[in-house]
Amino acid sequence: MIEYIRVVSKQRPAKRAFDMQVGAHLRVYVAGKITGDANYREKFSKAEQALTAMGHCVLNPANLPSGMEQGDYMRICFSMIDCADCVVLLPDWRESSGARLERAYAEKIGKEVVVADQGRIDEFLEKVGR
């Protein structure tokens, strides 16, 4: 399962044997495009299910209630990242200013940052999220 995730953080060397291995029990924050994506809850839910099946505790910003300002969401999400062991970026993370900020913040505070491989995300989610 580890082959479906590659490390994108250049700040710290990858701990490949530990990153997203089954049974590692990491606290994982999921980042990706929410604003402007009508199916964001489904997309984040699939990622959460897959990571939970791998034994991780998932911090999912798509579960936050609607009705707040972007700045409020970012403060909450940064706090969630503070609690996380690593951040997983969904393939569309570059399309989101919020996800780009989350990546930069996570790297700044020394968190591992990994990205789900675009070419294999569906296969990854199908195999792990059964």
What are these regions (language model features)?
Residues 2-130:
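Conserved catalytic or regulatory cores that recognize and/or transform ribose-phosphate-containing ligands
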